[in-house]
Amino acid sequence: MLADNLVEEFEMEDEPWYDHRDLQQDLQLAAELGKTLLDRNTELEDSLQQMYTTNQEQLQEIEYLTKQVELLRQMNEQHAKVYEQLDVTARELEETNQKLVAESKASQQKILSLTETIECLQTNIDHLQSQVEELKSSSQGRGRQKACDQEKPAPSFSCLKELYDLRQHFVYDHVFAEKITSLQSQQSPDEEENEHLKKAVTMLQAQLSLERKKRVSVEAEYKVVLKENSELEQQLGATDAYRARALELEAEVAEMRQMLQAEHPFVNGVEKLVPDSLFVPFKEPSQSLLEEMFLAAPEAPRKPLKRSSSETALSSLAGDDIVKDHEDTCIRRAKAVKQRGISLLHEVDTQYSALKVKYEELLKKCQQEQDSLSHKAVQTSRLLTRDLTGLVTQSEAGASGWEPTPVSPESISSPTTTPPEYKALFKEIFSCIKKTKQEIDEQRTKYPSLSSYSY
């Protein structure tokens, strides 16, 4: 639209507009623009050096953090082994505790049964003692009766004589004597019962003493079981404390991993290294040219970061996941930066193509209207257009790096002699550009890993 408006304005105007002074002013403006570009290039070199230093510091921090993560992983493995051993011991203690509880229940049942038998025996003993007292009282009464019988008067002599005579004439005298002795030797049933009860009492007393001894031993075993149970409960409490400590250590390891992934990964490497002042809108012409120069640099092949020390090699799956996430984020960030550079180049290309069309149309109109101008002026204008097109094609070819072709002042022939300041300024511009390009190449050779991650 602007080109059409300008063409319409030039069609409406009939007076000549082309002047060599305007051309010289444009060249001087271009020289000033180149000087500003050089200043900006120095600033970019300083920022790039700062980025190199920050990247080296971040690499050292990452190596230190990887060592810490490895140490934490080893500690976690040791704690896991300790926890496994504690779990095994806890299971064994639980099994022994269950066995002891079962034994204590059985012993309590035995104690109850023994107490019941003791009570029964005590009742039997009381009953037998009462019977013994009754028998004693009855025996005492019989003894009194015998004493009374002995106190009776003796039989008369005549009666004794008769008895003696009868005994002499008795045929079965020995049998009678045996019967008398057997009757005297036979005990009464009360006495037999008394002796039987005495024997039972002695047996019961012996059983009672045995039961008391058993009761004392069972009580001692019960106390030992209670002590072991309390010790097992204390050990279980210690295992709970160990488990809580294990959970705390696992939480600390997870926090360290999150801090490692959030604070010092290579995911946001390009965003941290490249300042935000470089990515501004395209309205500023010098900034757009600088971005074109910066993005047209040769893109080095991506290589993952290699660590030389074997101690920092992460053998577990967590380290592999971190490396994979890091590579994916680097690839995504490189694609985003490349897309941004492509969009900037496309915008520069469109604006340059529009300006080129306008310039060619104006040149054609000037050639048609100003036939009186010399052939040299026309030739200089064509050479300028060729040089500008060459510069744009070199800026678009970003794979081989941005290397502007120096415009020799001898090739530009004008009707009037060009000022020497213009020539010196352009020579200074191109020499500085070559020098900065060489310095950038040297820095890339010094830091190949940084160049691989910065793009």
UniProtKB/Swiss-Prot annotation:
Q: A GO CC term? A: cytoplasm
- Enumerate the residue ranges of region (Disordered): 132-152, 395-419
Q: Which InterPro entries match?
A: CDR2
User: Low complexity bias located where?
Assistant: 403-419
Keywords, comma-separated and alphabetical: Coiled coil, Phosphoprotein
Question: Coiled-coil stretches, from where to where?
Answer: 37-141, 191-264
What is the recorded name of this protein? Cerebellar degeneration-related protein 2
